[in-house]
């Protein structure tokens, strides 16, 4: 999975999500809850717009015309023992402060979308987020 994700640009993510959302509509779904954890560039560096990838998911949902609950995933560690993220996980990782900024920026983007768009929080797991991060 990590090798595939290392190939994806924001344009790729938007194109893939647009296709998936269109196919969901054709299958009868009216909305999607997008468990979204790809936040940073291939090197794990944040984009200038922290919510770049979230904005691409929002754009894809808007193009397709599907309802959206955006669930940015908070991913902090590689294991329960607080191991640092491995190279393939760097695109997911945030510290608490940066994740809150990312979520705030994504919330502003969601607010400009259709009225049925909403945003939540998605801590990845007990392995990837410690109690202080919650």
Feature-to-residue mapping (PLM):
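Metal-associated gating/positioning segment near the N- to mid-region
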Residues: 1-45, 51-52
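Metal-coordinating catalytic core of metallo-dependent amide/deamination hydrolases
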Residues: 40-134
């Amino acid at each position: 999975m990590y090798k595939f994700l290392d190939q994806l640009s924001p344009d790729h993510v938007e194109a893939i999500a647009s296709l998936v959302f269109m196919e969901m509509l054709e299958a009868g779904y009216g909305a999607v809850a997008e468990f979204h954890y790809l936040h940073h560039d291939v090197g794990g560096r944040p984009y200038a717009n922290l919510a770049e990838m979230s904005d691409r998911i929002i754009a894809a949902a808007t193009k397709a015309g599907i309802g959206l609950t955006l669930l940015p995933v908070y991913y902090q560690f590689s294991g329960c023992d607080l191991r640092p993220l491995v190279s393939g996980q760097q695109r997911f990782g945030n510290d608490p402060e940066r994740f809150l900024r990312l979520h705030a920026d994504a919330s502003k983007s969601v607010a400009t979308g259709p009225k049925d768009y909403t945003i939540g929080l998605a801590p990845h797991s007990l392995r990837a987020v410690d109690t202080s991060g919650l």
